[in-house]
C-alpha cells in the first residue's frame, strides 16, 4: 500500500538517479486538448503513438488516457503499450508525474511536487489544473510506492540531475515569481537538495529563447553522464539563443560538479529557427489558454530527447540540422541506438519528447 511520507528523500537516504540509468518503464499522457493541440489533437496523437511505440522496443510504456479517449488510444498504440484510464488536464508527463528517487538498496519512492500549470493564477497556460496536480500521487498508488508531497511548486522539466550529487536548473524558471514567490534562491536550493537528494545545484541564467515554460532546463541541456552534458547551441551571434547558450556554456565550463569534476560540454546545434505557420495556428481552438500565433518562433531543441534503455528517442523536424544532431548524439552515446521521431506536432504544443515522458528507475 502506498503511503505519504512526512520526512524528505535526503533525510531518508534517497536521491534522484540519472536518467541514463536503467528503467523499469516510461509513463506518458495521451493528448486531446483542442486548445493546445491542433485539429482536435489528431496529428499530435499520431506522434505520441510513434514516441510510445519507439520507447516500447526498449522498455515498458504506460499511457494514461481519459475516459473519452481510451478506446481511441488503445486502438492506435501497439499492444505492448499499457493503457490506463486516468483523468488529466493535458499531456506533459515530465512536469506533472512523480520524480522517482531511490536508495542504496534499490527501493524507490516518488516526489509529488505542487503543479500550477507553469505560472498559476498569474499566467498559467491553462485552468483548471487540479487533475494534473493529482497525477503524481495516483501513479505512486498504481506502483504501490511511498511518496513525499511537497508544498513547493516545481515541474519535472525544470531540473536535470546526474545521479551523482549534481542538479542543473535555470534561474529564469525557478526564480520566476509565479512559482515560489515567498522563497529566496537559497531556500529554493535547499528544497532541491532535500527532495532530490543532491549536494550541489548549478544555476544557469536562462533557458531556450521563447520557451513558454519560463526556460525549462530540459530544453536547454541533457545529462549524458556524471560530468558530461549536451548543450543547445548556435554559432549565429545575431540569434537571441546565442547569448543564452553562451552564458550557460561559460558557467558550465568554469564550474566543478558535486564530486569536483570539470564538466564536459558537447554542443548540440539547435534546429531552425522554426516558426508557427498560419495554417498551424488556425488549427488550434481559441479560448483562455496560451495562444499560438503565425510566425511565432518555437523553442525548438534537440536536447529535449528521452534516454531509454539502450536507445535515444530523438525529436527531429525535417530540418537541415537533423543529421548533425543524430551524428552528435551517436558520438556521445556509442552504445545506444538513435531512434528519431518527427516531432514538430509536439513542439507546436509547447515542448518535446522529454517533456511528454517520465522514466521509472529500475528497482533491485
Swiss-Prot record:
It is an enzyme of class 3 (hydrolase). Its EC number is 3.5.3.12. One of its GO terms (biological process) is putrescine biosynthetic process. It catalyses: agmatine + H2O = N-carbamoylputrescine + NH4(+). Gene3D superfamilies: L-arginine/glycine Amidinotransferase, Chain A (3.75.10.10). SUPFAM superfamilies: Pentein (SSF55909). The keyword Acetylation does not apply. The active site is at residue 355. Pfam families: PAD_porph. Keywords: Hydrolase. GO terms for molecular function: agmatine deiminase activity; protein-arginine deiminase activity. Belongs to the agmatine deiminase family. HAMAP family: Agmatine_deimin. NCBIfam families: agmatine_aguA, PRK13551.1. This is Putative agmatine deiminase. The lineage of its organism: Bacteria, Bacillati, Mycoplasmatota, Mollicutes, Mycoplasmataceae.
Amino acid at each position: 500500500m502506498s503511503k505519504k511520507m512526512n520526512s524528505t528523500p535526503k533525510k531518508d537516504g534517497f536521491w534522484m538517479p540519472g536518467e541514463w540509468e536503467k528503467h523499469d518503464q516510461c509513463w506518458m499522457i495521451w493528448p486531446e486538448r483542442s486548445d493546445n493541440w491542433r485539429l482536435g489533437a489528431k496529428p499530435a496523437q499520431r506522434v505520441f503513438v510513434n514516441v510510445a511505440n519507439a520507447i516500447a522496443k526498449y522498455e515498458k510504456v504506460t499511457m494514461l488516457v481519459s475516459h473519452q479517449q481510451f478506446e481511441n488510444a488503445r486502438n492506435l498504440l501497439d499492444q505492448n503499450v499499457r493503457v490506463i484510464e486516468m483523468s488529466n488536464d493535458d499531456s506533459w508527463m515530465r512536469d506533472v508525474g512523480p520524480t522517482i528517487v531511490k536508495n542504496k538498496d534499490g527501493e524507490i519512492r516518488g516526489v509529488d511536487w505542487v503543479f500550477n500549470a507553469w505560472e498559476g493564477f498569474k499566467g498559467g497556460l491553462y485552468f483548471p489544473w487540479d487533475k494534473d496536480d493529482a497525477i503524481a500521487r495516483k501513479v505512486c498508488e498504481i506502483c504501490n510506492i511511498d511518496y513525499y508531497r511537497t508544498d513547493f511548486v516545481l515541474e519535472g522539466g525544470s531540473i536535470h540531475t546526474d545521479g551523482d550529487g549534481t542538479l542543473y536548473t535555470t534561474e529564469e524558471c525557478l526564480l520566476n515569481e509565479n512559482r515560489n514567490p515567498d522563497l529566496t534562491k537559497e531556500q529554493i536550493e535547499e528544497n532541491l537538495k532535500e527532495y532530490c537528494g543532491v549536494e550541489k545545484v548549478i544555476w544557469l541564467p536562462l533557458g531556450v529563447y521563447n520557451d513558454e515554460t519560463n526556460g525549462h532546463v530540459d530544453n536547454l541541456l541533457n545529462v549524458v553522464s556524471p560530468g558530461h552534458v549536451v548543450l543547445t547551441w548556435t554559432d549565429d551571434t545575431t540569434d537571441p539563443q546565442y547569448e543564452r547558450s553562451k552564458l550557460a556554456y561559460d558557467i558550465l565550463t568554469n564550474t566543478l560538479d558535486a564530486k569536483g569534476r570539470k564538466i564536459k560540454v558537447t554542443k548540440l546545434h539547435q534546429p531552425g529557427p522554426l516558426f508557427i505557420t498560419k495554417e498551424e495556428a488556425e488549427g488550434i481552438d481559441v479560448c483562455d489558454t496560451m495562444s499560438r500565433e503565425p510566425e511565432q518562433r518555437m523553442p525548438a531543441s534537440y536536447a529535449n530527447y528521452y534516454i531509454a534503455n539502450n536507445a535515444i528517442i530523438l525529436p527531429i523536424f525535417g530540418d537541415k540540422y537533423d543529421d548533425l544532431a543524430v551524428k552528435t548524439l551517436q558520438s556521445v552515446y556509442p552504445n545506444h541506438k538513435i531512434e528519431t521521431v518527427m516531432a514538430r506536432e509536439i513542439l507546436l504544443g509547447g515542448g518535446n519528447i522529454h517533456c511528454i515522458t517520465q522514466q521509472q528507475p529500475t528497482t533491485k
